[in-house]
Amino acid sequence: MLGKKIEEHETNVYLVNTGWAGGRYGMERCFRMKLPYTRAMVTAALNGELEKAEFEKDPVFGLAVPKSCPGVPAEFLSQKALWQDDKAYEAAAKELAQSFIKNFKKYTNMPDAIVNAGPKAE
């Protein structure tokens, strides 16, 4: 039903990280996403600035990630860029994707478009 309304009203939907960045919780470089950056992302989404940005597709989660956003350093738009160790990030992303995939199996009879839009843990 939500998807139908989003499509019907040609609505853009944005997912904004307001949680942990730079690593898993408890890791040395792990930190909460900075509130001014979160606010800047929400503002850019609401005023239409984010629609003008160039996006790249996240290879694991399939999300369109902006390459730029007014008021936000580019590295804060990429979770991978915030981790010191690329391999550790990739392992954590794959593990999280596998958790999403496992949890989603309880939802049967979903359209292929929905199933195929989910994370890829290959």
Q: Where are the language model's segments positioned?
A:
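Conserved NTP phosphate-binding and transfer environment spanning the P-loop NTPase/kinase superfamily
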Residues: M1-E122
